[in-house]
Amino acid sequence: MAAATSATAIVNGFTSPFLSGGKKSSQSLLFVNSKVGAGVSTTSRKLVVVAAAAAPKKSWIPAVKGGGNFLDPEWLDGSLPGDFGFDPLGLGKDPAFLKWYREAELIHGRWAMLAVLGIFVGQAWTGIPWFEAGADPGAVAPFSFGTLLGTQLLLMGWVESKRWVDFFDPDSQSVEWATPWSRTAENFSNSTGEQGYPGGKFFDPLSLAGTISNGVYNPDTDKLERLKLAEIKHARLAMLAMLIFYFEAGQGKTPLGALGL
């Protein structure tokens, strides 16, 4: 008796404006037909799988559709955390520039979050407005000018230069020659595989976006995506808050003073 087995798979993508809110949305149709023959007996089985439609892009102006690239730029596909299609000046048309601006937004947003916290805590602790914190020449500084210069110029400059190099050449700074004072360069490697989110034991010591098992960091994709969205939202709020703080400082006011505290 002869036995024969044949299997064919046809993947057909199609779009549905109704399902995607007027935007192209891909679906997959998988058709499998298998036959197993033994003598005169034949078994035929068909399987059809239809994938769910992709979620429509979010707009920075709710309930507004269309409007061309001003309201819905084609170069923003919603894949970036916090992407609501806001790019009226077209700064992200070039993918290379888009990658650079996202990195810049992350870095400036993280500094802004630290600054906002420092402004509130510093004034609440000492009573000195943040824009007058270094105005008293007779105050006893916790460190010398040389220490400040060395910290800013050498240490922070060195770290920032390595981050800049790693942006253009990912993972180039996680090798032994780049971290000679570390026993394992892997501690400084990108554990998530995404630019701007290194993760790992040193950059995620509390395991907020992953777990550490037998000394190895394992990222949790779901947690990481939620935290990336939360971070970029708080970062943007902090940058706006700093802009307001600058306007207040120009009038001699402080954030706590504006709140009546």
Swiss-Prot record:
Transmembrane segment boundaries: 111-131, 139-159
Transit peptide: 1-51
Domain of life of the source: Eukaryota
UniProt-listed InterPro entries: Chloro_AB-bd_pln, Chloroa_b-bind
PANTHER family hit by this protein: CHLOROPHYLL A/B BINDING PROTEIN (PTHR21649)
Protein name: Chlorophyll a-b binding protein CP24, chloroplastic
Major location (coarse): plastid
GO biological process, one term: photosynthesis, light harvesting in photosystem I
Species annotation: Spinacia oleracea (Spinach)
Keywords noted in UniProt: Chlorophyll, Chloroplast, Chromophore, Membrane, Photosynthesis, Photosystem II, Plastid, Thylakoid, Transit peptide, Transmembrane, Transmembrane helix
One function term, GO molecular function aspect: chlorophyll binding
Membrane disposition: Multi-pass membrane protein
